[in-house]
């Protein structure tokens, strides 16, 4: 066996899970994890939720402490950037000019925030929520009575809005889309989210394009939009993320809205794998390549990468699943909603709880979204796996058990 280590580029959730899985399968393999941040690996979902509310929420993002990595003999090189992959020499070049050979390489480089595209005046801070440092900086600004402008009506923007309202801030959400959660979920779910926040005092400016973030004369900021100005003490931008593919692209690997890999996390270079939300991975259940920004991918896909690094032939095959917690509301989504689907609403979409099912052209259930009905997601998973084709009227009737359709 080569004395060269397994090298993991990235030090986030997917990187940690890759290292855990490698160590579980091979007690002796040398493992090196390289990350640009100086923090220990942490899970990101808490950053836009509990980490904005209290210190305990931030601490829960750190699943493993430094002693665990030492005990597992996983070498951490934090605050270090990989500048290049030298594929022929099978080594990576670091930002200090040194190189590190690898037996196999895993790219778990994750993603970065999509930044605001308009001008921002000097001295004005536009907050993002991607790192622990981001969450700390924003939490310090969420003081009761402050005006908070949130640019973006997706999951991150709404979670930040919920946290800010819980802390007593006055919140306005601004989004160019006509409705909330427009990119991922049916209209009925976005309408429910709108009511949920509206009832708690969040203001909305939908179908509104932010153009610039200016410094206000008396302090704070002004968000200039195509429909007027929004005055704020704190501005938060939550308009999506971009996969960190530059390292892979410079190395000549296939990149297509993510690092393109097969179901086994393999790139075209059999010494290089990729895992986590940076991957455009083939999903056997969907029959196509997808890039999914979710905790589930970071949690479970790395086990497949680790197994195949060591010679297995496993495949990552899970339906996309994600969740969002806003106030006392839990929203879960399974599968992918898309054009051409028929939606069936089960329950009370005005007050909740309710579930929305997406039916494909042949009548099979292909997706589901549940508001405060997590058990329906478990049932939907079984129905999708069984290829269930329920009668839409019966499916919409909450008195008819979902088991009936199996």
From Swiss-Prot:
Q: What induces it?
A: Expression is positively regulated by the transcriptional regulator AndR.
What GO terms fall under cellular component here?
cytoplasm
Residues recorded as binding NAD(+), renumbered to this chain, are 152-161
Q: Does the keyword RNA-binding apply?
A: no
Enzyme Commission identifier(s): 1.18.1.3
Q: What happens when the gene is disrupted?
A: Cells lacking this gene are unable to grow on anthranilate.
Q: Which UniProt keywords apply?
A: Aromatic hydrocarbons catabolism, FAD, Flavoprotein, NAD, Oxidoreductase
Annotated binding of FAD, by residue? 5-37
Task: Give the multimer and partner information.
Answer: Part of a multicomponent enzyme system composed of a reductase (AndAa), a ferredoxin (AndAb) and a two-subunit oxygenase component (AndAc and AndAd).
**What does this chain do?**
Part of the multicomponent anthranilate dioxygenase, that converts anthranilate to catechol. Probably transfers electrons from ferredoxin (AndAb) to NADH.
Protein name per the record: Anthranilate 1,2-dioxygenase system ferredoxin--NAD(+) reductase component
Origin organism of this chain? Burkholderia cepacia
